Structures are given as structure tokens and as C-alpha cells.
Amino acid sequence: MPDLSFLLYALAAVAGCLALPVLAWYVVTALWGLAPLRGGVGRPTEKRLRFAVIVCARHEEAVIGQLLDSLKAQDYPQDSYQMFVIADNCTKDDTAGAARAHGATVYERHDEKKVGKGYALEWALARIREDYPDRFDAVCVFDADNLAAPDFLSRMNEALQNGADVAEGYRETINPGETWVSGCYALYWMFLMRFFYRARRNLGMSCMVCGTGFAFKMEVLGPEGWHTRTVTEDCEFSIQQITAGRTIAFVSEAVFYDEQPRDFATSLHQRFRWLVGAAQATYWCMKTVIRGIRAGHRGSVDMLGFVLAGPAAVLLLLQGCFFWRRRCCGPRRRSQFCAG
């Protein structure tokens, strides 16, 4: 009969061999975030893309007006963009009325079975393409609690006109000093912007969109439109685009401001949703990533690292727990640490 200890050590070693390459990939690429920022959004252009600016909102009556006012204050020609608010299952307040009062075109959606931003975007984009055929060249997506810098659309226009298919802006935090939770979020986004987004821009690689403050050419949707299945629709959309050979540019010059959770319970709920979404992405998107690698799209290798990051973290955690238990509960110390 095989020695059980040997089998456990072998499994732990295999777990480490599988997980460490993913960790090493992220560490090596992150180092490029320390380098000076390379490249720009592209040359200024007189041509103006026509943007459909979409805001998915649920019970956001209190904050939606501030975002819409910041969008109306853009230095972009007013006739080259239109604001759309998707009042998604808003049963507790008048989000739709507040949005109309601030000049937005409002679509009200009521579907308690398909709840989530991905479903709302799929529904809204289908409606907009039907109601405004061939009117818009690009789409820009915001959350209701955001604010946009005055030149946000101008910077996105430059990026999309100079080779990018999708563009992600630079996220700043509105309320970094409000609570310790919002302060931790501010640090999280600051590190992510530098060591993930900036690093990939310096390496000439595509980044990923992060839920809000991003834009894309209408043509990337194709005839099927927006279609995502996970609760992290931004990650799934990014994987779809990169594995198809398209470019997602990090436009650090396009700044937007995002309000962060104030309390730990809200943060925990959000993190759990992200965790579920990462697991879904690993399950649903692995075939897409493999197809992208076989097609020779180099960004697909980075996406492979992304979909494997969650399983790799779990493997490293289990490996650490195993070796900790072996150290603490070995034959000489079992009576001390493992009594009962």
C-alpha cells in the first residue's frame, strides 16, 4: 500500500508546480508598472466618433444626477454623444425620473429573473441599436456613482481613433478618506492601475475593462450584440475581445472618479460576487482562451493567466495549509497541537 504521506507531499508539490507559473507571470509583468509610462492615446484627431453613453442604474436616484451633470460638462461636441440611463428593476426609488430631469434618455427594464449589469447591457444595447440604427460609432459605459473628467470622451475618442478597439480609463476614488474600507479600496485601485494596467501599457499588451469607465467601438459587438453569462461581465467581455485578437488600451489620460463601499458588509458582498464571477470565468471562458491561443493571439496567454489565477490561489492556499499542518502536527508535536 502506498505511503499516504508520500502521496500527500506529491500532491502538494504538483499543486505548487501548477500554481507558481501563474504567480510568476503576474510578478514579472507587474515590474513594468515601475517604469515610466510609455506611449500615448494617439494623435489628436478632428474626427469625432458618435458615442452612446450608457449608465446602468438600480436605485441610484440620489447620485445619478451628479454623473449626468459631469457628462453634460464634457468638452466633447454635444451633438456627438447621447446619454442613456437603464433604470434596471428600480422599485424603491425614482431613478428614471431623476435621470430624465438631468437630460438623459431613459429605458426602464423590469426583469426579476435576469438580474445584473450584464443582462441590462445586453437588453439596452439591443434596444439602442434597434431605435437608433447606424447612429452611434462607439459606446461608453459608466456606473451611476461615477464622475467623469471634462476631457474623458475626448481622450476615449483619440484612443479609439488610433488603433484601440476597446479603451479603459483611469479610476480615481471619490471617497478615499471616508472610512477605512473606502481607504483600502483606494489603495487597491491605485496599485491595480499601476501594476496591472500601466504595466500592460508599457509592455504593449491589452488590459482588461474593470466594470465602468470604458468605451468600445460598436463594431466589436457584431450582429449578436453584447452577450455575457457571468456576474463579472467586464472580465468576460475582456476575454472575448482579447482572444478574438482585438486591442484593449489603457488610457490613463481619461480619468473618472468612482465611489467606493463605506462599510465592511458591503465590501464583503462585493468581493464574494467577484469571487463567484472569477470561478464562472474559469469555467465558461477556458475554451475561449484556448481557441485564442491556438489562433495565435498573444494576449490570450495573459487571459490564460487570468482564468487560472483563482485556481492557482486555491492550490497555493491548500499547499500552505498542508505543510503548516505537517509542521505543527508531526509525530513529535502531535500531542501539543492536535490533541483531541
Task: Give each language-model segment a name.
Residues 32, 43-45, 305-340:
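Membrane-embedded multi-pass helical conduit in multi-pass membrane proteins
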Residues 49-52, 82, 236:
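Cell-envelope/extracellular polymer assembly enzymes that use nucleotide-activated donors
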Residues 1-47:
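N-terminal membrane-anchoring/stem segments of glycan-assembly enzymes
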Residues 87-96, 111-113, 147:
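A conserved acidic beta->alpha catalytic loop
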Residues 69-80:
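Short, acidic, metal-binding catalytic loop of nucleotide-sugar glycosyltransferases
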Residues 93-94, 142-159:
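Acidic donor-binding/catalytic loop of UDP-sugar-dependent glycosyltransferases
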Residues 65, 91-100, 150-151:
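Acidic helix N-cap motif at the loop->helix transition within catalytic regions
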Residues 30, 108-110, 114-132, 151-230, ...:
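Long helical/loop segments within the catalytic core of UDP-sugar-dependent glycosyltransferases
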